[in-house]
Amino acid sequence: MAAELFKLTLEGESEILGLLTLTDFPGEFRMQIHLLCVSRDNQGKGKKYDGIAGSLIAFAARTATVKDFDQACISLLPKTELRAHYKSKYGMMDGGPQLFHEGARLQAIIKKYLP
């Protein structure tokens, strides 16, 4: 299973705001986020744009729901220092070493970041 790479840019611009890699696990109705990266200009208090990571997570959620509809799930294995951040800011749930979204939480993050 190869990961597929996606990039987030502003329409008509070439500057990459964020990157995401996804691997599909069809037997599990799950998309795994392997890489979730936000450009340096868009991190921390002085960031240029807000919501880059949320938009990438929402894109993964939408991709999963298009593929597996109501049984869809997305997951990621976060860096230790980001685990609490993903849970508090994006509402991700504990699934052992991984965090995940499924069901209504997938729809909520899509509505919030991809209106």
Residue map of PLM features:
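Residue-level recognition of alpha-helix initiation/capping sites
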Residues: 55, 77-78
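Non-catalytic substrate-recognition and accessory regions of acyl/acetyltransferase enzymes
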Residues: 1-47, 59-74, 81-84, 88-115
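ATP phosphate-binding glycine-rich loop and adjacent ATP-lid/helix-beta elements
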Residues: 50-58
